[in-house]
A protein has these predicted regions:
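Aromatic-rich carbohydrate-binding modules that target alpha-glucans
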Residues: 60-116, 126-184, 188-199
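Acidic beta-to-alpha connecting loop that harbors the catalytic carboxylate
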Residues: 76, 128, 254, 387-390, ...
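Short beta-strand segments enriched for Tyr within beta-sheet-rich domains
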Residues: 117-125, 245, 300, 304, ...
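Short beta-strand element of the alpha/beta-hydrolase
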Residues: 232-235, 242-253
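Cap/lid segment of the alpha/beta-hydrolase catalytic domain
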Residues: 249-317
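Active-site nucleophile loop of the alpha/beta-hydrolase fold
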Residues: 253, 285, 352-360, 388-389
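Primarily recognizes the serine-hydrolase "nucleophile elbow" in alpha/beta-hydrolase
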Residues: 261, 321-376
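C-terminal catalytic histidine-bearing segment of alpha/beta-hydrolase fold enzymes
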Residues: 383, 392-455
Length: 455
């Protein structure tokens, strides 16, 4: 499959424009500058002294429970495009152009958002219209430009996107929270980056220097003859080979391991007793084209339940129970999660699907082929979530959930206020795992999804 032959996600405009608003603070400065342009330098300095953190958050004086979220950028430019995950409409970029305070180099744009919203964002300044990177070339070039924008220098909270670019993150007060506080940040050295691209079973390292009380082990496996790809297997400290343990199968593993150091974040949850100790297997996607080929219409579940699972059973003491085998994926990977549970419920019995690419018909075709009256998916469990800002995917999730439940699957159906966004997915993984593999202390964290029974 090539870029010219693979399926293309629908590119439809937002059904409603993003909720632009007016910040009282910025509007007051703007009006003063119009009346007193000679005070531009003074008023700009006063504004930046007043703004202690960005984006600027103000309670909406007109709508209770809403916030006015003002993004600020300072720098010489003829135009600045603000890219906010799933608020920026690629079919209507003009609505995301920032406004300039007259006579200054300060740019701003305000949205009215509910208090549980989270999103990654970045800035794309252009010194001239001809240099605007978002106006040069195809949809692919546009996507590349948006992904490679600049983070907010005044916001220390960041998230790395799939392509490896650092973006800033805005989280409003009621957004789901990581149970142990802020999302944990580890250095590459602490995460074992020096061994990420090593080879051979046992080419691992401890993570005692990662701020954890106990050390785990990361094995870098390059058994290409058997597995056909590189994988990484993390064994947390509480695990011993004297008994079997659950296993997490993480699709797009190179992103979660190298960009987000997910093994150490989940190890902290295990240490705290929030989720059960489990092996974490990071599965390399093989790159863009291979990912589209395998996680699209191909049957990647056959690989997960065949060569991979058989190899893991030989080398690690993984649980024989399908309920203890959890496959995790996002976007195309999330579609693969659901298809694997449908096709192989006797081998993998639990899954976390985040923003599944349900615009492809393949899952619905497979569900329609089931005899739902026999409840063939009884005993399987899934956490299925989508962002309310995902205007193409969100309307499709209820249909999938209905059909899966009809076939016997226990589904936790969740909608979060956000987009197609690692900044949201990484936080929500904690609640999903507390649901599917709860530890003795599995309680909802501040603002997190409740850890209750599946329905």
């Amino acid at each position: 499959m090539t870029a010219s032959t693979r399926p293309t996600p629908p590119k439809l405009p937002r059904p409603q424009p993003a909720p632009l608003a007016t910040s009282p603070t910025l509007d007051a400065v703007h009006q003063r500058l119009l009346k007193h342009p000679q005070l531009a330098s003074q008023l700009q300095a006063q504004l930046w002294q007043q703004v202690t953190a960005t984006p600027l958050l103000e309670a909406d004086p007109t709508q209770e429970g809403k916030y006015l979220v003002t993004f600020l950028w300072r720098g010489a430019a003829q135009r600045v495009l603000l890219f906010v995950n799933r608020l920026t409409d690629e079919k209507n970029l003009a609505d995301s152009y920032m406004r300039r305070l007259p006579g200054t180099d300060t740019w701003y744009l305000t949205y009215r958002m509910d208090a549980d919203w989270r999103a990654s964002y970045c800035f794309l300044p252009a010194l001239s219209a001809a240099q605007a990177p978002w106006l040069q070339g195809s949809q692919v070039r546009l996507r590349q430009a948006l992904d490679a924008g600049l983070p907010d220098p005044c916001n220390p909270v960041t998230c790395t996107n799939r392509r490896g670019f650092v973006q800033s993150v805005v989280s409003l007060p009621l957004a789901p929270a990581w149970p142990l506080g802020d999302w944990p940040v580890f250095s590459d050295a602490a995460a074992g980056a020096g061994s990420f691209d090593g080879g051979g079973l046992g080419a691992g390292r401890g993570d005692a220097d990662a701020g954890r009380l106990n050390a785990g082990r990361l094995d870098v496996v390059a058994d290409l003859d058997t597995l056909g790809r590189q994988i990484w297997v993390y064994t947390p400290a509480p695990i011993s080979r004297t008994q079997s343990y659950p296993v997490l199968l993480v699709l797009d593993g190179e992103v979660w391991l190298k960009r987000h150091h997910l093994h150490l974040a989940l190890a902290q949850l295990m240490d705290a007793g929030l989720i059960a100790p489990a092996y974490i297997v990071f599965i390399d996607s093989g790159g863009t084209e291979q990912r589209w080929q395998e996680l699209g219409e191909s049957n990647f579940g056959r690989y997960l339940t065949g060569p991979l699972l058989n190899w893991l059973k030989t080398h690690y003491a993984i649980s024989p129970k399908p309920a203890d085998r959890v496959v995790i994926g996002q976007s195309l990977g999330a579609l693969t999660v659901l298809r694997t549970l449908v096709a192989y419920p006797q081998l993998i019995g639990a899954g976390i699907s985040q923003s599944a690419s349900l615009w492809q018909d393949v899952l619905f075709n497979e569900l329609n082929a089931l005899d739902a009256t026999q409840t063939p998916l009884a005993g399987t469990r899934a956490w299925i979530e989508v962002g309310s800002q995902e205007w193409i995917l969100a309307p499709l999730q209820p249909k999938a959930v209905h059909q899966l439940r009809k076939a016997g699957m226990q589904v936790k159906d969740m909608v979060y206020n956000g987009g197609h966004d690692y900044a949201c997915w990484r936080i929500n993984l904690a609640s999903a795992l507390m649901q599917l593999l709860p530890g003795p202390n599995a309680l909802p964290g501040p603002g997190a999804y409740p850890a209750g029974n599946l329905s």
